[in-house]
Amino acid sequence: LVRTYSERMYWHARQMVFDHDDANDIIQNSFIKVWEALPNFRGDSKLYTWLYRIVANESLTFLKKRHTRSLLSFESYSQTLENKLIADPLFNGNKIQLALQKAIATLPPKQRNVFILKYFQDLKYEEISEITGISVGSLKASYHHAFEKVKNFILQIDRYSD
């Protein structure tokens, strides 16, 4: 189970929190929860959607705790995430990728989760609904708002870089 899914789960957590060590902690906690809950897995959803839900929830919980502990405004916290991304030795992206990741860092955590699952993981809204427990209609609206925010952020950066 760990060998099969750990890399995909790691990258989902990593896109949520941007920090390698934080993502590893989330994955470790997630797989502990999976191990404890596996006997109760009924198979109502696909295994990977169940795993994604656990990782997404762990990521959101982590972000809430980090935000609450730091007592930073959302904007300050987003800036902290951007700074972590820029300083990350594993990030070797170009300016466009950096702008995209910075834009994603400005999204509220739940919107970020929806955006990542749809844009990067290319999941269908029905699958995202299984993972998040959010209706398909709400997901479409959330993704649309996230997409517009990301697009406007990148256009704003492009305007100021000319």
Where are these regions (language model features)?
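A short pre-motif secondary-structure segment
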Residues: 114-118
